[in-house]
A protein has these predicted regions:
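Eukaryotic scaffold repeat domains enriched in small/polar residues
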Residues: 1-191
Length: 191
């Protein structure tokens, strides 16, 4: 799976590089069943459904069937439960719950956009925003959130969540509590 932020697509390939599925419309941004606006991550759920973090401009998660048929979207820009600023990374834990790395504002730049693509207020840091990992059930319903880390990327292995932050650190979290089990400093940002 690949996400193409600026091409507004998510693609599934075989290990040999054969394209199997394209979600979104290349080069066309939007916020509907067939368009993304800066997708950032993708997860295949335990039931085979596909969840895309449409993160940079639309601030939503989008569900598709294994064949690529649109199911629904969850979220909008905001700081509430199952609302997002920038859903930048996405993973699922061993129980199928979704974890969303939600970055605060200031991640957008005027040169990255075309007129009408993004609201002007979204290009500035939000001083009241809290970086967080939101935990949702498999359908996208809010469970809780962890705010003690500034997440940039996420991965799940066993009963642990690996979260890299914007300070080039890696935190290994307990998937049930979100508590930091260990930390590795000055490591690559993306995992």
């Amino acid at each position: 799976w690949t996400t193409d932020r600026d091409g507004h697509t998510v693609k599934k390939y075989t290990p040999d590089g054969e394209l199997l599925l394209t979600l979104g419309t290349f080069g066309e941004w939007g916020c509907d069943a067939s368009h993304f606006n800066g997708p950032t991550a993708v997860v295949v759920q335990l039931d085979g459904n596909i969840v895309v973090a449409d993160g940079y401009w639309n601030s939503r998660l989008v569900w598709f069937t294994p064949e690529g048929e649109y199911i629904k979207s969850v979220g909008e820009w905001g700081r509430g439960q199952a609302q997002f600023n920038t859903p930048h990374a996405l993973t699922q834990d061993s129980k199928g719950r979704l974890l969303v790395a939600d970055l605060c504002g200031g991640n957008f730049h005027d040169y990255m956009t075309v007129p009408g693509q993004i609201e002007t207020h979204r290009t500035k840091p939000d001083k009241d925003c809290v970086h967080r990992i939101q935990r949702l059930d498999a359908s996208g319903a809010y469970i809780d959130e962890w705010t003690h880390i500034m997440p940039l990327s996420l991965a799940s292995y066993g009963n642990e969540i690996y979260a890299s932050d914007k300070m080039s650190n890696l935190a290994i979290l307990d998937e049930e509590t979100g508590q930091v089990k260990s930390r590795v400093e000055n490591i690559a940002i993306y995992i």
